[in-house]
Amino acid sequence: MKTKVKKKSAILTIIFTFIVLIGVKSISTAEEPFTGKVYLQGTNKGVLLFIQKNYRTQKDNKTIMKHVYTTPEGKMAAEEKVVYVNDTLDSYTVDMAYGNCGCVLHREGQKVTFGFTRGDSSKNGTADYTNDIVMGPTLNDYVKLKWKRITNGEKVYFMLPAMSLQRLAKFYLEKNPQSPYARPGVMVVKMNISNLIFRAFVEPVDLVYDLETKRIVEIHGKSLLQRKVGNKIENPVVDIYYEYGR
């Protein structure tokens, strides 16, 4: 029973990342610069938790893509980083300020290796590499790549690194016209885990895209981000709103 609870808890911590955090073979259509404001859900933008910014740097054959989260006061909260070498996924890292938690994924040929640390404990593992590995900094490129299929109502499947389990978890994207965030001019894309057992414990995340520009404009759901509430660390449910250009 304890093993099942641990696995359920681990899946719960990876559903968002985004926030959720894509190892797409081509990265020629990188995200436009944006600023995301991360609010505690249910406060009508009354409680600002984090500021999100994206960055992309290119040097010789190496491309680095980042999502950086800071507190409203400017303190580092979390960073996701994807590195490509010769347009091929090389590594993915996540560093969290609270909880002394970090993750790293490296590609080694047709395998990926995982490293996960929390406090004084660490875990390592390997899995087979696939072309549809999804991570936060390139998620929006992946949605654009599959845009026609999603708008036509198809489910699009991909693999998301579940670092604490040292495995790749299967997720899907699907148009969600019944979402409370659906309205004229946007398409809501639901992201959910494929496994039926875990789906009973995990709430899906709604990604809101502008139909004309294909830009992501909102995200609503459980966050991988951590905040300290009293003596406890929690993963809040959030509303993220994006603005473009800096």
Language-model region placement:
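Bacterial N-terminal signal peptides
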Residues: 13-23
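Bacterial Sec-dependent signal peptides at the C-terminal "C-region" and cleavage site
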Residues: 21-32
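Intrinsically disordered, low-complexity segments
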Residues: 7, 24-26, 227
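Residue-level marker of positions within ordered structural domains that often coincide
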Residues: 24, 87, 148, 219
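Acidic, serine/threonine-rich low-complexity disordered tracts
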Residues: 31-64, 68-86, 92-99, 104-109, ...
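Solvent-exposed helix/loop surface patches that form functional interfaces
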Residues: 115-186
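Bacterial N-terminal signal peptides that target proteins for export
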Residues: 2-14
